[in-house]
């Protein structure tokens, strides 16, 4: 699936190493390969954006390597492809040898996979399903400040799905563990690939059922009910958390304005 890049090759360039992106001038490289010293490099076509190919190059650059978070404010489709590139680059880097027999592996030519020629084992990129849920109580939404994000941002609750657990069960468990409350009338909203490092966010809205807020101090600094027109600092646009909050605010405005 990969090929040697030629002088006149053009498109969007995802140059990635160890979960970092090359972002000259703070942007994804776009244009001719020759303009970015990529001629002769091996590249993998991982998609298309606005009629142009998106290429993945597994390479470290000495300068301007940054997080894919830096392009989160770009169009959702381009951010998604950048995330795909970073995740695939890390997958290929971390699966050079077979976990069963220890022999070297090689990329599949037909799908995103690594193959072992010795024991015939096949590996696919790991995807970790997560739930994220906006909880409404009359004209208010439950927002929390997470221990791992000490930047003042308040967001909705989220967590990983455990083995043998449905998405609905994961919502109920995570909400109870982190905030001590029960929810009802759960409704699926949307999903978002989230390459930090390889999550798939499944987004829900729910209504408060019962209980008082009792936070898990290992997960949260604080949590509280916030009226829809008096909210704290929120996650940035482009995140599924921000969409859930805005959808909840819109519902509250329709009822209480």
From Swiss-Prot:
EC category: hydrolase
UniProt binding sites for Zn(2+): 98, 101, 116, 119
Named cofactor requirement(s): Mg(2+); Mn(2+); Zn(2+)
GO MF, any single term: manganese ion binding
Reaction(s) this enzyme catalyzes, per UniProt: a 5'-end NAD(+)-phospho-ribonucleoside in mRNA + H2O = a 5'-end phospho-adenosine-phospho-ribonucleoside in mRNA + beta-nicotinamide D-ribonucleotide + 2 H(+); NAD(+) + H2O = beta-nicotinamide D-ribonucleotide + AMP + 2 H(+); NADH + H2O = reduced beta-nicotinamide D-ribonucleotide + AMP + 2 H(+)
Positions contributing to substrate binding: 69, 111, 124, 192-199, 241
Gene3D superfamilies: 3.90.79.20, Nucleoside Triphosphate Pyrophosphohydrolase (3.90.79.10)
Binding-site residues, a divalent metal cation 2: 174
Residue sites binding a divalent metal cation 3 per the record: 174, 178, 219
A single GO BP: NADP catabolic process
Superkingdom per UniProt: Bacteria
Pfam families named in the record: NUDIX (PF00293), Zn_ribbon_NUD (PF09297)
Renumbered ranges of motif Nudix box: 159-180
Keywords noted in UniProt: Hydrolase, Magnesium, Manganese, Metal-binding, NAD, Zinc
Cofactor note: Divalent metal cations. Mg(2+) or Mn(2+). Binds 1 zinc ion per subunit.
Domain Nudix hydrolase: 125-248
PROSITE patterns linked: NUDIX, NUDIX_BOX
A GO cellular component annotation in the UniProt record: cytosol
EC number annotated for this UniProt entry: 3.6.1.-, 3.6.1.22
Residue sites binding a divalent metal cation 1 per the record: 158, 178, 219
Homology family: Belongs to the Nudix hydrolase family. NudC subfamily.
Record's subunit section: Homodimer.
UniProt-listed NCBIfam families: PRK00241.1
Function in brief: mRNA decapping enzyme that specifically removes the nicotinamide adenine dinucleotide (NAD) cap from a subset of mRNAs by hydrolyzing the diphosphate linkage to produce nicotinamide mononucleotide (NMN) and 5' monophosphate mRNA. The NAD-cap is present at the 5'-end of some mRNAs and stabilizes RNA against 5'-processing. Has preference for mRNAs with a 5'-end purine. Catalyzes the hydrolysis of a broad range of dinucleotide pyrophosphates.
Protein name: NAD-capped RNA hydrolase NudC
Native source organism of the sequence: Salmonella schwarzengrund (strain CVM19633)
Gene this chain is encoded by: nudC
